[in-house]
């Protein structure tokens, strides 16, 4: 039922389906947390925002990668998803994650704060994609990177050409692309 409506409207994955986000797709490895983290080129001490973090599938390994001197902001509009992420962080003894119940585009993030921003199968759920990408551009430091991961099995799938056009319109430059036509990660850079 959710999938039917999600294809027609910008509806986020409901909290009760959070377990589904955790499953590894047998047809592709590009959307696996370890692969996404590998393509982020993270270092200790970096600051990262995970936009639409969901149940924390990528948030937790990112927090481990940036270490205790780094910071991760887990941003989601659903309190239930943030609660799931918080429970995983507590179980992993991670204290470098800040939880923010908000949508991107609401101007709740600080200007030039982040080294990396993530949109993992979430761009299609955002009603005003241009405003969202503008805010992400604004909160990234010069030279910072936005990483967009999409998989065709997601009802909100965004084609690479669509993401390139939207991101280019707000000032991002393509850095590198990984994957195929059914699943990809597009890394975009904010010019220095």
Regions found by a protein language model. Give the residues of each.
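Class I SAM-dependent methyltransferase Rossmann-like catalytic core
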Residues: 14-30
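Conserved alpha-helix/loop element of class I SAM-dependent methyltransferases that forms part
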Residues: 27-46
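Class I SAM-dependent methyltransferase SAM/SAH-binding core
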Residues: 49-51, 55-106
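A short acidic, Gly/Pro-enriched loop at the edge of an enzyme's catalytic core
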Residues: 105-117
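A short SAM/SAH-binding and catalytic strip from SAM-dependent methyltransferases
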Residues: 115-127
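A short glycine-rich, Lys/Arg-flanked "PGG" loop and its adjoining helix->strand segment in the class I
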Residues: 130-142
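Conserved beta-strand signature within the Rossmann-like core of class I S-adenosyl-L-methionine
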Residues: 143-150
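Core SAM-dependent methyltransferase catalytic element
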Residues: 170, 179-192
């Amino acid at each position: 039922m959710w999938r039917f409506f999600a294809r027609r409207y910008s509806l986020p994955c409901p909290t009760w389906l959070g377990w589904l986000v955790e499953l590894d797709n047998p047809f592709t490895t590009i959307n696996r947390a370890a692969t996404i983290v590998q393509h982020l080129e993270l270092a200790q001490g970096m600051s990262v925002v995970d936009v639409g973090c969901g149940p924390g599938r990528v948030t937790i390994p990112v927090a481990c990668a940036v270490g205790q001197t780094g910071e991760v902001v887990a941003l989601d509009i659903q309190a239930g998803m943030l609660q799931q992420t918080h429970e995983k962080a507590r179980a992993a003894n991670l204290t470098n994650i800040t939880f923010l119940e908000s949508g991107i585009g609401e101007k709740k993030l600080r200007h030039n704060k982040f080294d990396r921003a993530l949109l993992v199968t979430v761009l299609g759920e955002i009603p005003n994609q241009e405003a969202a990408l503008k805010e992400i551009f604004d909160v990234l430091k010069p030279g910072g990177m936005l990483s967009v991961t999409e998989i065709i099995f997601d009802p909100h799938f965004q084609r690479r050409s669509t993401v390139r056009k939207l991101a280019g319109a707000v000032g991002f430059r393509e850095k590198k692309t990984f994957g195929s036509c059914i699943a990809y990660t597009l890394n975009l850079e904010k010019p220095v």
